[in-house]
Amino acid sequence: MRDDGKRGTIDAGAMLAQVEAWSAVNTGTANLAGLASQAAMLAEAFAVLPGTVELVDPAPVTAVAADGSEFDKPHGQHLVVRVRPQANRRILLTGHMDTVFPADHPFQHQTWLDGETLNGPGVADMKGGIAVMLHALMAFEATAAASSLGYDVLINSDEETGSLASADLIAALAAGKLAALTYEPAALPDGTLAHERGGTGNYSIIFTGRSAHAGRNPHEGRNAVVAAADLILRLKALETPEITINPAK
């Protein structure tokens, strides 16, 4: 990166060391202890930037249990970094610290598949992306152009389950920005980078039956399994090339 004779350099070794350290921490979305450790590590790492670093509490989220009752679902804190908030031009950079692998999942360790390929939980999705983001910003801050651009960084803790505890925060930070960049790898099979993603919606449906004797008075019963199977088939039939419907837990 060059600007007016100044160059920002990127230390590949430091990037790799951070990815290995971060990926050694289990950050399944429900692992609050692991997420707390990861958030602290990220806060320390992003403190090298000339801005403020804050851990923001998650918004409350209500989930539905199998019996239809509602309960509060806890989440980890989100990392927010603000650099030059008064700048006329500002952008948003986003990522997530959680992974799909819970604390009791067998995939917990990193392995070098060859001299250039590291396999481990969160290495690609997306602790590697967070390292790319951080070191790109560090290099940018070493250029003369940095003073003319402000930015916010958001690393949320609940992306893998739909970002319900961070959606309002994302919207608030995105307001007024010139652009928003997300550092999760999203390449097509031919290597083409995805430039947009479809939205998602999640719904919980509870089926409640009524018991009856299968031989004596079946007409008085209501079979919740049959009702669920019927709805699943009807929902799946609504799919189009633009809409994917996934009836699953």
Where are these regions (language model features)?
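Acidic/histidine-rich catalytic neighborhood of metal-dependent amide-processing enzymes
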Residues: 126-196, 244-247
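Short glycine-enriched loops at secondary-structure junctions
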Residues: 97-100, 106, 186-187, 197-200
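Predominant activation on well-ordered alpha-helical scaffold segments within soluble catalytic domains
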Residues: 20, 43, 131-134, 138, ...
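Short Gly/Pro-enriched turn/cap motifs at secondary-structure boundaries
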Residues: 69-72, 193-197
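Buried hydrophobic positions in well-ordered alpha/beta secondary-structure cores of metabolic enzymes
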Residues: 26, 93-96, 133, 153, ...
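Acidic/His- and Gly-rich active-site-bordering loop/insert found
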Residues: 2-119, 142
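Glycine/serine-rich anion-binding loops at beta->alpha junctions
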Residues: 98, 116-131, 213
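Acidic-enriched catalytic cores of C-N bond-cleaving enzymes acting on peptides and small amides
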Residues: 195, 217-249
